[in-house]
UniProtKB/Swiss-Prot annotation:
Protein name: Small ribosomal subunit protein uS11
Recorded superkingdom: Bacteria
HAMAP family: Ribosomal_uS11
Organism encoding this protein: Granulibacter bethesdensis (strain ATCC BAA-1260 / CGDNIH1)
GO terms, biological process: translation
UniProt key word Transmembrane: no
NCBIfam families: PRK05309.1 (NF003698), uS11_bact (TIGR03632)
Amino acid sequence: MARNATSSRPRKKERKNISSGVAHVAATFNNTMITISDAQGNAIAWSSAGAQGFKGSRKSTPYAAQVAAEDAGRKAREHGMETLEIEVSGPGSGRESALRALQAVGFAITAIRDTTPIPHNGCRPRKRRRV
């Protein structure tokens, strides 16, 4: 019984023509994730500090967030994206550097929103670090 010959190499992604989208920047204490989606929320490109080869505590640096944002921005520009709204969420150190990196790639930024969830006295926070 012969199997159908299928190639194992990945298919080339089809180029979408999307002019505007939303960049979701999730900056945690340990990592920074950037997802660029269209207006409906379908992901077009993504990147993170860990995906760029940073490991451990170097993932949480502003430079790692900048490299990740540049990578996600380049991938999104390949699909024809030119204008971005930016949604920043989380308390991490890579928030501003990711924003500046997306500007440097050449996007026209129309809006910046901070969607960090703020508790109205919800769960008890972690204990204060003493170094």
